[in-house]
């Protein structure tokens, strides 16, 4: 480009105009946040859930929309805004306010708790019984003070039988 001032560009973009092609391409391919009204409302609702006082039946939120409408991006933005906080470096304890878990392709409790353990960075032994996995996941969730559990692709519950769906919903 021959004009170094680029008055038609936003100030934060002007510096990229003369950057090498690889850098400009990388910037173009990066994720972008577009804060439309419903996305901002979803973020506000999740913030409200995060600060909700503990009680027996905690409220929940379900983000619903067609594919490629940005549901996962909303969750990712929220998660990035609430990153892990070191609590006690000497003991290695951390606080994980928001934990995002990918729902397994079917409503399988063992796979779900394996996904929770993986998201927490905990070891998971495939041969462990469901009760062992569940106990370990619950202990680590409490120890890391997880305030909000986000389950992405929760509609995968529907791929199971009615009995599997009910059992999994009861688990949640």
Give a label for each model feature.
Residues 57-59, 105, 124:
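Phosphate-binding site recognition
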Residues 1-59:
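A short, basic N-terminal segment
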Residues 52-56, 90-95, 140-144:
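Conserved catalytic network of the ASCE P-loop NTPase/AAA+ motor domain
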Residues 55-77:
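Walker A/P-loop nucleotide-binding motif
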Residues 4-20, 43, 108-115, 123-171:
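Mid-core helix/loop region of P-loop NTP-binding domains shared across ATPases and GTPases
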Residues 58-62, 98, 148:
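Residue-level preference for the first positions of well-ordered beta-strands
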Residues 80-91, 122-124:
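Post-Walker A helix-loop "phosphate-sensing" segment adjacent to the P-loop in P-loop NTPases
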Residues 96-107:
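A short hydrophobic beta-strand->loop->alpha-helix junction that borders the nucleotide-binding pocket
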């Amino acid at each position: 480009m021959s004009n170094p001032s680029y008055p038609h560009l936003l100030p934060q973009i002007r510096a990229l105009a003369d950057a090498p092609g690889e850098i400009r391409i990388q910037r173009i391919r990066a994720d972008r946040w577009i804060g439309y009204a419903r996305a901002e409302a979803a973020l506000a609702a999740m913030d409200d859930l995060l600060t909700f006082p503990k009680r027996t039946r905690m409220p929940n939120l379900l983000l619903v929309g067609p594919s490629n409408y940005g549901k996962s991006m909303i969750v990712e933005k929220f998660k990035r805004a609430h990153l892990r906080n070191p609590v006690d470096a000497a003991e290695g304890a951390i606080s994980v306010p928001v934990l995002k878990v990918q729902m397994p392709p079917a409503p399988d409790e063992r796979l779900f708790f394996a996904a929770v353990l993986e998201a927490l960075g905990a070891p998971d032994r495939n041969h462990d019984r469901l009760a062992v996995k569940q106990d370990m996941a619950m202990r680590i969730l409490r120890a890391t003070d997880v305030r909000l559990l986000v389950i992405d692709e929760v509609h995968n519950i529907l791929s199971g039988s009615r009995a599997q769906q009910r059992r999994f919903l009861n688990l949640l």
